[in-house]
Amino acid sequence: MVLQGEAGDGWSPERFELSFGLQLDADHDPHSVPDPVVVDGRFVLRGSIDLVERHTTSRVLRVTDHKTGKNRTEVTTTINGGRTLQPVLYSLVVEEMTREPVAAGRLYYCTQAGGFTSHTVQLDPIARKTGLHALEVIDRGVELGFLAASPDTGACDYCDYRPVCGPLEEKRATKKNKGLLADLLALRDLP
């Protein structure tokens, strides 16, 4: 973290392991809160944010989620079809918690596998709308009681839960009612 903070990019680490809606303990930032955070007045979120930084000049905040895998993002990635929600959703959470503007969320691939690269998502109106849309899709699935496993082609190759689902989940997914999966399939088309 020291090297990251000394990178000369104008960002200074401010909060580490900032949790919300989780049990408070010594492993989490002192600014953590025991209650979940409500985003957009309707979505209750819980989690832990790896790093919150403050820009030394503009004083805005930036949220960072550390990743250990390969960087599979593209320049246009915002939520990556619902697979990469942290930059946007964690930014919205930090805005709600601090009542301060968050300029961006980013993924920092902090291992050799990820090439020590980062991907930044500016928290502009389009990113906000896209993140909230993803939450709406998830909320509808919960409301309808339909959160069926429906992996995208090749997704099981990188999934930690493959032993739970078994080797044939992709094949089973092709037999599911596409009408019930319409929200999920539309979400996957978002950048």
Question: Across the structure, where does each feature detected by a protein language model lie?
Answer:
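RecB-family 4Fe-4S metal-dependent nuclease core
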Residues: 1-191
